A protein has these predicted regions:
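Exposed regions on extracellular, virion, or secretory-pathway luminal proteins
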Residues: 2, 28, 40-42, 54, ...
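A structural detector for beta-sheet-dominated domains
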Residues: 26, 38, 52, 69-73, ...
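Glycine-centric low-complexity/flexibility signal
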Residues: 4-17, 97-104, 124-281, 286-299
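Enriched but not universal
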Residues: 1-94, 282, 286-299
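Generic detector of isolated residues embedded in canonical secondary-structure elements
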Residues: 48, 120-122, 275
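Extracellular beta-strand-rich solenoid/capping regions of secreted or surface-exposed proteins
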Residues: 73-92, 103-119, 136-157, 277-278
Length: 299
């Protein structure tokens, strides 16, 4: 299979980072994918090639892996590498290739391929992988929803992040409701044709504001006057009706928790989404390295 990527970003060759073998042809080094050896008079393709250097054997070539490049221009749904690879007609577990993010992509799942697989993950400048923002809590003291995860991997990967990887912001908490209490004077006929009066206490509902949506791709929805979350910033909370009702909390910015309702009187803000679930599977950094990561990094 021909190598499907020949990309250099910020001076870093993806082919070099993924460990493709090279040979010198007419004074120039060229990457190769297949190495054949002559055995018993016939040329045979090799799966692995080792050389002895300094008394130790070192692997210099792998030929079993499915090679790929997936370019993501931005989508409002998760990109699942395993599903995409299956769609290319490959059902094995050994892969080597590149994912290039060229827009605002909601969530990337790089699956659980073999331990000798490698994925070069490149996020271009002004591009991002982000989780969905949490929805705001409704008025009456409901909690904001949590933001969603951005990146998941149980496959070894190389990170080259010139953009942003961020969990979705948490939604803001909804403010408590209350009642406005007021008095009316009621008049009525009484003895000897006189008019009498009495004070009557009445009340009417005073509603709190809903929470704002968390930032993300897409942003979370604001409720009951709360604003929707945007790509990078959370939406403001909805206003209150007074009379000890309370405003909703602001949705969290990208990779941040949502705020609770005004003065702690109402729902709690949602938790920020995880930026990377599978950071221990990061094989190495290349180019821009980790770059701008917003949110927790686990596993």
């Amino acid at each position: 299979m021909a190598i499907p990527y020949n990309t250099t970003n910020t001076g870093t060759s993806i082919r070099d980072a993924l460990g493709h073998s090279s040979i010198k042809v007419s004074g120039n080094w060229q990457h190769i994918e297949n190495i054949n050896i002559k055995h018993s008079g016939s040329w045979q393709d090799t799966k692995e090639v080792y050389v002895k250097s300094g008394g130790s054997w070192r692997k210099v070539h792998e030929g079993e892996h499915f090679l790929f490049q997936a370019t993501l221009s931005g989508a409002q749904n998760e990109f699942n590498l395993g599903t995409w690879i299956s769609g290319q007609g490959y059902s094995g577990n050994k892969i080597k290739g590149a994912i290039i993010v060229e827009g605002a992509q909601q969530r990337v799942n790089m699956g659980n391929f073999s331990s000798d697989s490698k994925v070069y993950l490149r996020i271009n400048a002004n591009c991002r992988i982000a989780g969905k923002g949490g929805n705001g809590g409704s008025r009456g003291g409901q909690n904001g929803q949590n933001g969603q995860r951005a990146l998941y991997s149980r496959t070894p990967f190389i990170i080259d992040n010139a953009g942003i990887i961020a969990g979705g912001g948490g939604g803001g908490g909804g403010g408590n409701n209350s009642n406005c209490v007021y008095q009316n004077t009621n008049y009525f006929g009484c003895m000897k044709a006189q008019q009498c009066s009495e004070l009557v206490q009445n009340q009417s509902p005073a509603y709190g504001g809903g929470g704002g949506g968390g930032a993300g791709t897409p942003g979370g929805s604001g409720l009951d006057g709360g604003q929707n979350g945007q790509a990078l910033s959370g939406g403001g909370g909805g206003g209150d009706d007074g009379c000890e009702s309370y405003s909703g909390g602001k949705g969290g910015n990208l990779g941040q928790d949502g705020d609770g309702a005004e003065g702690g009187n109402g729902g709690s803000g949602g938790t920020k989404g995880t930026a990377i679930d599978g950071i221990s599977y990061r094989y190495s950094q290349s180019g821009n390295g980790n770059g701008d990561i917003r949110g927790s990094q686990i596993n």
